Every structure is written in structure tokens, then in C-alpha cells.
């Protein structure tokens, strides 16, 4: 797990912007640039996380507000026993479930075809995608951004901060127009490269996984090659 904090990333962004002493960009602007870069990164390469939750009551609706940064649920096993000494295979994959949001809080609805419903103290094993976090940013306690992608976030944040500065300068009387153009060119170049790298990550994620996923079973008109 990375030990990088928001202060570390903020310092790196300021170095890239040649403003080590924060004479031009304040912390709020830099932090917002980091947020924007993380948000774009999270859409291109969300983190895959697995956890087990114990149900507080009976029912098909399961509150998932304890899962920080949740974006999508990608898999659910139920029934599941984390204390079992023998593996259950194939696992009890739930084929029908829906994630919806109630006043901004995620709720998982389990559409179990056999009529059964989860009971209190049952365990669910859940796979989900989440946005990356940086220690100290918006209350995050740990950094979940892979260390090898920190430089990518720094570049994106610098681009966002530069473009924010351009907006500020354009609205200031007596501003050196040439300086604004140069700064805007720098900001756009940083963001262009940042988004190109995100496209590469997105393409790489699409190529992962098994050749054939789960699908319809064979019927009497189908055949399988050996």
C-alpha cells in the first residue's frame, strides 16, 4: 500500500508548475486539480475491490454505504461462508442484482430466482469498482492509487491547475496576453498527454480477462468443439 499523501502529490504538482513556494497557486487550487485528475483516472481505470459483508437483517435490499468510493458492483456470491474450511465450487454466484441509489446512498437489490432471500448474519462476498483515494484528500485515511500511476495524476493535476490559472488571468485587467497563451498551451499539452495515457489504460483494461465469459448454455441445436 502506498504511503503517499495529498501533501506529497501537492508538492510534486507545484514543482511541475515551477511554483515550489506556492506564490501563484494555492493549496485549494492544486487539490482541486488533483481531484479532477483522480476523477478522470477513476473512470478509465477504477479499482477492483473484494470484500465480505455480514447482513444486519433479513431481506433482498442490502445497504452498501460502508463501501467507500463505490462506483459499480461487478459480482456477488451468496450464500457464502468465509469461515468454511472446504472450497465451494462452483461458487454461488447471484445472476440477478441491481445497484441503485437512495438519497445518495448505494443499495444492492438481490433478485434471487428461487424465491429465497438473505437472512440476518448471512455473509455476502462482493466485488466492486471504486474511485482511487489519496491520504488526506477529502478525509481519506489510506492511499489506494497505485504508486506507479502517481506521476500520471501529477501531470493531469498540473494541467487542470494551469487552465484554472488561465481563467483567472483572463479576467484580470492588465494581464500579459502572451503569458496567458503560453500557460494555456502548457495546460492543454499536459491534459492532452494525460488523457492519452488514460486511453491507453482503458484499452489495456478492455483486453484483460478470459477469452470467453459466462453466457448461455448449449441446447440441442448447439455443439461444442473439442
Question: Can you describe what each PLM-predicted range is?
Answer:
Residues 1-226:
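Glycine-enriched, solvent-exposed interface loops adjoining structured elements
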Amino acid at each position: 500500500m502506498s504511503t503517499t499523501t495529498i501533501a506529497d502529490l501537492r508538492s510534486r504538482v507545484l514543482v511541475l508548475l515551477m511554483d515550489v513556494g506556492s506564490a501563484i497557486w494555492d493549496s485549494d487550487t492544486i487539490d482541486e486539480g488533483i481531484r479532477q485528475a483522480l476523477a478522470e483516472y477513476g473512470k478509465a481505470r477504477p479499482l477492483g475491490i473484494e470484500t465480505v459483508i455480514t447482513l444486519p437483517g433479513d431481506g433482498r435490499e442490502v445497504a452498501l454505504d460502508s463501501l467507500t468510493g463505490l462506483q459499480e458492483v461487478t459480482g456477488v456470491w451468496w450464500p457464502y461462508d468465509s469461515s468454511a474450511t472446504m472450497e465451494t465450487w462452483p461458487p454461488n454466484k447471484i445472476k440477478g442484482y441491481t445497484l441503485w441509489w437512495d438519497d445518495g446512498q448505494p443499495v444492492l437489490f438481490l433478485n434471487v430466482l428461487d424465491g429465497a432471500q438473505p437472512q440476518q448474519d448471512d455473509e455476502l462476498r462482493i466485488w466492486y469498482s471504486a474511485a482511487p483515494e489519496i491520504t488526506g484528500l477529502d478525509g481519506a485515511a489510506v492511499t489506494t492509487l497505485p504508486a506507479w500511476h502517481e506521476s500520471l495524476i501529477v501531470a493531469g493535476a498540473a494541467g487542470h491547475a494551469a487552465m484554472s490559472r488561465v481563467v483567472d488571468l483572463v479576467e484580470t485587467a492588465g494581464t500579459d496576453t502572451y503569458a496567458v497563451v503560453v500557460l494555456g498551451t502548457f495546460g492543454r499539452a499536459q491534459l492532452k498527454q494525460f488523457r492519452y495515457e488514460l486511453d491507453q489504460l482503458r484499452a489495456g483494461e478492455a483486453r484483460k480477462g478470459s477469452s470467453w465469459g459466462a453466457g448461455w448454455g448449449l441446447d440441442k441445436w448447439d455443439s461444442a468443439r473439442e
